[in-house]
Amino acid sequence: KGTVYGVDIQPEMLELLKKNLDQLGIKNVKGVLGSIQDPKLPPNSIDLALMVDVYHEFSHPYEMLQNICSGLKPGGRIAFVEYRMEDPNVPIKLLHKMSQLQVMKEATPHPLEWVETITALPRQHIIVFKKTSATPVTR
């Protein structure tokens, strides 16, 4: 039940998604062609934005997070899944890791409130925020 939006900035990845969904008979996933600043989500439409090992790659993180927040329903959640910078034993280059503090600083100007950090994964943390009714800071 519900709709899942699969967002990518590469049309070929959305074509692959569609092919896989068609083969599996999955009907509730919609591919969305986003941009480097905007995931192009319908306003106030999503309960959860899940970003797995991607946020650190954004060239325009402020704008992207602002637009993700616009797509979230009030009380909706954002989950950042990123390799733990705090753990030197995680065999990933530093530029592909984020600390919890970094993620929290990125979220601060936006209408987001920290909910929890889940450390159950062996190399990544899941840092969860919920959308508040506050207005984001504009740059």
Residue ranges of model-derived segments:
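Core SAM-dependent methyltransferase catalytic element
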Residues: H110, W114-R139
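Conserved SAM/SAH-binding beta-strand->alpha-helix loop
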Residues: Q10-P11
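A short acidic, Gly/Pro-enriched loop at the edge of an enzyme's catalytic core
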Residues: Q37-A49
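A short glycine-rich, Lys/Arg-flanked "PGG" loop and its adjoining helix->strand segment in the class I
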Residues: Y62-R77
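Conserved class I S-adenosyl-L-methionine
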Residues: L14, R77-M104
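A short SAM/SAH-binding and catalytic strip from SAM-dependent methyltransferases
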Residues: D47-Y62
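Conserved SAM-binding strand-loop segment of SAM-dependent methyltransferases
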Residues: L24-Q37
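Conserved SAM-binding loop
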Residues: L17-K18
